[in-house]
Amino acid sequence: MELNSEDVLVARYGELVLKGKNRSYFTKQLKINIKKAFKKLEINNSIVYEFDRIVVFDIKKEQRAILQELFSFLPGISLFFFASQIVREENKLLDLLFNLFKDFNSFKLEVKRRDKNFAENSSNFKKYLAVKLFEKYQLKGVINNPEIIANIEILKEHFLVFTERFKGKGGLPVYSSGKALVLLSGGIDSPVAASLVMQRGFNIDFITFINEPNKNQKTIEKITRLANLISFNKTICSGKLLVFDFTAIQKELIHISNESYRIVLMRRVFYKAASMFKYDCLVTGEVLGQVASQTIENLKVIQSATPDTFIVRPLIGFSKDKIIELAKFFNTFDISIEQHLDTCSEFSPKNPTTKAKLINVEKLESELIFLNDLIEKGVSELSND
């Protein structure tokens, strides 16, 4: 049976449609992002940008997997589907539906008129198709528990038919909100934080702090895989990973006179080093009260290390269950739970302070006369790479 149909991908914008006068700014950035991604992935299909959606034409079977993966990751896309597009002739639509339903015993139709000039309303046209399919092919339409559901969109010159929708990440296009540096560990929280800010339009890079890198190659490889996953192998954002050798600084911090402040001082070092790269903001996976260093008192003292730097903590009020749910949604969970050597846990004292005082921190830092030089040296080495 020759159906003369063309496979297309249709992707919807989601909240971009609601942006009013600023809408064109966001949709223009989304177009740029798609063009860059297609070029990197060597996809040459033609694209039409409509008011509330994108249509990619002439989808080949071998392209579906990579396009599905890309549009699942691409911020700014709320949902998408692959569809068969045929000329708007009822006999061709019936033939396509029969070909689609022939291996099933029951079906359901959903019809949407995007072309409001179409003579029949959606409900009547759906009934008409169901009767024709039963008369010609003895196919039975049902309301409850059908084996297959076909969605039909009526366009000006074509019908679109599809059976499955895929959820996108939603949000705003990358590069529409500035550039952020994410403090990325190998755990569950920071990859989720990175994914959330990317959804809000940030172009992101990553920095991770490793002690004795030669002994932590597996950890570095794990964090690299997370960075590549979040950035879709640098296809949808910059995705650069900076690996900061923390060994010399850690050897300094081990000698402070009050070991309960170790983690607080260590995180202040992280903030100071990361802020020297002059991004629009820093992003962390900190969650209020989740661990000893993340009490409100400690977070205030840690943040005071970089008073002129904007710190974004997307997870600050989330429960662990919610963060795990998001990690699974962003596909980072499986990598995050792989075992690795963690700088914080290796360095943590038996009784970490939960109520750090800035006066005590400043006194302890004054004991470490080489600390700032070591931070600047580490930043300089990465800046010159």
UniProtKB/Swiss-Prot annotation:
Question: What are the disulphide bonds in this sequence?
Answer: none
Cell compartments where the protein resides: Cytoplasm
**Protein's pathway:** Cofactor biosynthesis; thiamine diphosphate biosynthesis
Primary place of residence? cytoplasm
- Give a Pfam family name: ThiI_fer
For the THUMP domain, which residue ranges apply?
Answer: 65-165
Gene Ontology MF terms in the entry = ATP binding; CCA tRNA nucleotidyltransferase activity; tRNA binding; tRNA-uracil-4 sulfurtransferase activity
Could you provide one GO biological process annotation from this protein's UniProt record? thiamine biosynthetic process
What general EC class does the enzyme of this chain belong to? transferase
Q: Name one GO cellular component term.
A: cytosol
Biological function: Catalyzes the ATP-dependent transfer of a sulfur to tRNA to produce 4-thiouridine in position 8 of tRNAs, which functions as a near-UV photosensor. Also catalyzes the transfer of sulfur to the sulfur carrier protein ThiS, forming ThiS-thiocarboxylate. This is a step in the synthesis of thiazole, in the thiamine biosynthesis pathway. The sulfur is donated as persulfide by IscS.
- Catalyzed chemical reaction(s): [ThiI sulfur-carrier protein]-S-sulfanyl-L-cysteine + a uridine in tRNA + 2 reduced [2Fe-2S]-[ferredoxin] + ATP + H(+) = [ThiI sulfur-carrier protein]-L-cysteine + a 4-thiouridine in tRNA + 2 oxidized [2Fe-2S]-[ferredoxin] + AMP + diphosphate; [ThiS sulfur-carrier protein]-C-terminal Gly-Gly-AMP + S-sulfanyl-L-cysteinyl-[cysteine desulfurase] + AH2 = [ThiS sulfur-carrier protein]-C-terminal-Gly-aminoethanethioate + L-cysteinyl-[cysteine desulfurase] + A + AMP + 2 H(+)
Q: Recorded E.C. number(s)?
A: 2.8.1.4
Family listed: Belongs to the ThiI family.
What highest taxon heads this organism's lineage?
Answer: Bacteria
Chain positions recorded as ATP binding sites = 183-184, 208-209, 267, 285, 294
Organism for this UniProt entry: Mycoplasma genitalium (strain ATCC 33530 / DSM 19775 / NCTC 10195 / G37)
Give UniProt keywords alphabetically. Answer: ATP-binding, Cytoplasm, Nucleotide-binding, RNA-binding, Thiamine biosynthesis, Transferase, tRNA-binding
Instruction: Give the protein name, as stated in the record.
Output: Probable tRNA sulfurtransferase
Question: PANTHER family, alphabetically?
Answer: TRNA SULFURTRANSFERASE
This protein's encoding gene: thiI
TM segment ranges: none
